[in-house]
Amino acid sequence: FEYEKQMRFGNIKPLISINISAETFMSTDFLGRFKKIMYKYQTHPKNIVIEIIEEVCLYDINIAKSKINNLRNLGFQVAIDDFGTGYSSLSYLSDLEVDFIKIDRKFVLDLNKEKGKKVLRDIINISHSIGCKVIIEGVENESQLQLVKIFGADFVQGFYFHKPNT
């Protein structure tokens, strides 16, 4: 929320997120292709977030770790997208040097239950404790927004703000 305020006043540039499939991420020419795009468009990677789904960690954690480190060394930021939809493991989060954890909308849908609130709050706290910013997906109303703000979410996405553009 502070980020949005700073962006409004022109102090920082908006982030551009790019979703990458597991297949693309694990391909051998993935990093080379990104370097070419950066060069071609004279793009500075610090404002680009590469979003990978947690599934990539199931293929080979060491390869995923290496590719994430290479992306970050180039200046990109990296997010684990849809956290909690697959075989989430908190253990791999501490092994991966990512900038953001994007928590899946199913956790927002459970905010009407006490257990759901506790789980979401704990995931946010764990993410912060390992140095990750948290993006909550699927916020659709004011009460959900207020809860995730109280829980400490750094960023939110959802239909409450805008329907997706095609």
Question: What are the functions of these language-model segments?
Answer:
Residues 35:
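Catalytic-site microenvironment of enzymes
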Residues 67:
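Conserved functional hotspot residues or short segments at active or partner-binding sites
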Residues 7-14, 42:
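Catalytic core regions of nucleotide second-messenger enzymes
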Residues 2-9, 38:
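Short catalytic/binding micro-motifs of nucleotide second-messenger systems
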Residues 4-7, 21-28, 47-62, 74-166:
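EAL-family c-di-GMP phosphodiesterase catalytic domain
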